[in-house]
């Protein structure tokens, strides 16, 4: 699908995990104008107050929209998606896409009807997630692990750091002996970035399911017939709320997402 005029799409997360969703969308829609914003000044969202998450997400999206008129926003963060979508939709007239743990497809794929959900602590405790399980995995045994450490490991990897498999195995150790566990939901957008390492720790699992491809298809559908707000040729950019520690981290992120430049947003 090619666009003669580029729709501008913003992907937003507290960290770099949302780049996994961005990559899936860019692969499907290579000719759009892409912006990526991450609130590293308040990272991680998983254990933060809901009101603070809502306020910061809205403020950052509005600030980017002032300079780069947006046609669609993807909240590429499972934790934020459980709380911010209603407020964003009240303040924007453009499509807003959230990220939902892929519990339904995992339950459908599972042959043993024994599935696992790895997510942040914030996502795990949301009523919304329990409702998804009740509606779509009521016939399955569902295990849950809420982990901030896995998010930090994924961040380190994308910035050029090493993944400590021993730490990863420790986080996932409750599932090590569950032989019937055959499907795992990667319920945080960071986790596809360390999927290979997670697979090594859970060799009995046949299916690892994330939301990236489904979100990309949803974005493609919503862009049909959209009236693009800004019709100039644009560069793909990334935004953060706090300077990164070193130039290597900046370059790793720019290269991974094929972005032209990184912009630091001031409060």
UniProtKB/Swiss-Prot annotation:
Pfam families in the cross-refs: Asp_Glu_race
What species does this protein belong to? Histophilus somni (strain 2336) (Haemophilus somnus)
GO MF entries: glutamate racemase activity
Q: Which UniProt keywords apply?
A: Cell shape, Cell wall biogenesis/degradation, Isomerase, Peptidoglycan synthesis
Report the protein's function: Provides the (R)-glutamate required for cell wall biosynthesis.
* Entry EC number(s): 5.1.1.3
The processes (GO biological process) annotated in the record are: cell wall organization; peptidoglycan biosynthetic process; regulation of cell shape
Catalytic residues of the enzyme: 77 (proton donor/acceptor), 188 (proton donor/acceptor)
Residues the record lists as binding substrate: 13-14, 45-46, 78-79, 189-190
Q: What is this protein called?
A: Glutamate racemase
Please report which protein family the annotation says this sequence is part of. Belongs to the aspartate/glutamate racemases family.
Can you state which reaction this protein catalyses? L-glutamate = D-glutamate
Q: Could you tell me which pathway this protein works in?
A: Cell wall biogenesis; peptidoglycan biosynthesis
Keyword Cell wall biogenesis/degradation (UniProt): yes
């Amino acid at each position: 699908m090619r666009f003669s005029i580029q729709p501008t799409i913003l992907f937003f997360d507290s960290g770099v995990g949302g780049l996994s969703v961005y990559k899936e969308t860019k692969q499907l829609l290579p000719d759009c104008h892409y912006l990526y914003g991450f609130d590293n000044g308040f990272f991680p969202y998983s254990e933060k107050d809901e009101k603070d998450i809502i306020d910061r997400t809205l403020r950052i999206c509005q600030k980017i929209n002032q300079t780069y008129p947006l046609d669609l926003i993807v909240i590429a963060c499972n934790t934020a998606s459980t709380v911010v979508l209603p407020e964003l939709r009240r303040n924007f007239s453009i499509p807003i896409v959230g990220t939902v743990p892929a519990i339904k497809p995992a339950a459908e794929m599972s042959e043993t009807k024994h599935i696992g959900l790895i997510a942040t602590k914030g996502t795990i405790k949301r009523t919304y997630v329990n409702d998804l399980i009740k509606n779509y995995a009521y016939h399955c045994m569902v295990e849950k692990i809420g982990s901030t450490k896995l998010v930090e490991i994924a961040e380190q990897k994308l910035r050029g750091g090493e993944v400590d498999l021993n730490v990863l195995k420790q986080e996932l150790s409750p599932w090590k002996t569950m032989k019937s566990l055959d499907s795992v939901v990667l319920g945080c957008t960071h986790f596809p970035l360390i999927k290979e390492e997670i697979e090594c720790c859970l060799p009995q699992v046949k299916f690892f399911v994330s939301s990236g491809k489904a979100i990309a298809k949803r974005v493609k559908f919503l862009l049909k017939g959209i009236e693009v707000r800004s019709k100039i040729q644009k560069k793909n950019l990334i935004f953060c709320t706090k300077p990164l520690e070193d130039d290597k981290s900046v370059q790793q992120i720019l290269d991974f997402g094929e972005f032209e430049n990184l912009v630091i947003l001031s409060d």
